[in-house]
Amino acid sequence: MKKISLSLLFAFIGLSINAQTAEELKKEQAPKKVEIEKLQGEVNSLQDKIDALNGWKKGAFGTIGASLSGFNNWYSRTAPNASAGNIGVSINGYANLIEDTYFWRNSGTINLGWVKLDDESFDGDEGFEAATDVFTISSLYGRRLNKKWALSGLVEYRTTIIDNFNDLGYLDIGAGLTWTPTSNLVVVMHPGNYNFVFSDASTAFDSSLGAKIVADYTNKYGGLSLKSNLSIFQSYSDGDLSNWTFTNSFAYTIWNGLGLGFELGLRNNKQEALNNAVNLNNALAAPLTPPTFSTVDNKLQSYWLFGLSYAL
């Protein structure tokens, strides 16, 4: 009994010493945490001052996603011998020149995706097929009226690069005003904009004069980088010729510029919906009544990508 009591006593003493040691270490740790937070605040403040300096500012980040699989004599499947793959890559880059009297902002976005489902019992399905194909570049030049407003001109080009480069293609050229309430937000308002549409075969597309509105937000919160861009064209001649595109990119850095990324794109374009409906109708053995702008189902277009992110 005495041995048990002594053992319990020593165990209690040991726990008390460990508890005291932990409390002492926590007390010693607390002021150091305060110092780190203070230093981090100073670092962030200095970075804000650096970002506010004139001159060129460049950067890029993106997402890479991939999934590959293979089956050999896997008899529970309809196709026991098959391979599948899904690969996606996105790149968001910018190069901005900021001066006291003018600015020149350039940006580019690429999002490409390929998919494959190869049933080895059939020929002709061995390769990857394009799934996502987005290419956008823009250049905005502005002469400042004051700190937040500027007279500006914009050139924006959108197309695909895997399939049918410049078919379809969109080129916006316009002029108006640009509002920059902060260094991270740019809002373009151009009442004079011409939307050129390039298409080799389809008659569903027309170029037109209209208004262009672009809102672009780019920022970084600790390890999180984000970019949102809304681009709207409102045709003066016909609402069916209007379109908008909204893209959002997020990248969270975990280690040495690498982390997790997510990108989501939404788009509405009635001309593209009509062109797709016409092509599907023409492919029928017995084509139906040709679709028109008034009958076509203009569904919301979307794409997304999740995977490994990188920042340069």
Give the residues covered by each predicted segment.
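Repeated loop/turn-to-beta-strand initiation elements of outer-membrane beta-barrel proteins
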Residues: 101-104, 147-151, 183-187, 218-227, ...
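Outer-membrane beta-barrel "beta-signal"
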Residues: 298-312
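Residues on the lipid-exposed face of transmembrane beta-strands in outer-membrane beta-barrel proteins
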Residues: 64-66, 89-97, 139-143, 157, ...
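Cleavable N-terminal export/targeting peptides
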Residues: 1-54
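Surface-exposed strand-loop-strand hairpins of Gram-negative outer-membrane beta-barrel proteins
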Residues: 67-92, 118-128
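Transmembrane beta-strands of outer-membrane beta-barrel pores
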Residues: 64-72, 99-101, 110-116, 157-161, ...
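Outer-membrane pore/translocation modules
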Residues: 116-214, 288-289
